[in-house]
A protein has these predicted regions:
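Nucleotide/phosphate-binding catalytic cleft detector across ATP-hydrolyzing
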Residues: 2-32, 38-134
Length: 134
């Protein structure tokens, strides 16, 4: 849930009146071991998880062995992220973001991973800094 706080403002103001900016949001968390979908909504000022799904991919194994993510795993990561984004859209998410953790920072081809995910899914994609991971 902490990752969701990176994309969900507590409140937005319009014309002096406070309103909630997004009703339902999703994060695709691309980590060293899994690609996780987390869908949440804001209820009474707090985030409530509606769905969480993980798919094991082990990008970190490739990075550990060769310093890069292999072409097959790049393609598989893009396919899994695409499936997560489609699922989030079916669940009515107002905002979807992809947040890449250590694979984006540690792999020699981390930028290629981020580009591939963004091109495949057409949603905002970025690498988190270690201090943002919490």
């Amino acid at each position: 849930m902490q990752l969701l706080r990176l994309i969900v403002p507590k409140r937005a103001t319009t014309g002096g009146m406070a309103r909630i900016a997004y009703v339902r949001v999703a994060i695709v968390d691309v980590g060293a071991n899994t690609l996780r979908l987390l869908v949440a909504t804001r209820e009474e000022g707090r985030l409530v998880a509606l769905r969480e799904q993980r798919v094991q991919l082990s990008l970190g194994e490739d990075i550990e062995h060769s310093g890069t993510i292999g072409k097959e795993k790049l393609a598989e990561a893009a396919a899994i992220a695409g499936a997560h984004v489609r699922r989030a859209r079916k669940l009515g998410c107002d905002r979807i973001d992809i947040l890449v953790t250590s694979p984006g920072r540690q792999a020699a081809n981390g930028r290629e991973l981020v580009s591939r995910l963004a091109e495949t899914t057409r949603v905002p994609t970025r690498v988190l800094m270690p201090e943002e991971e919490g």
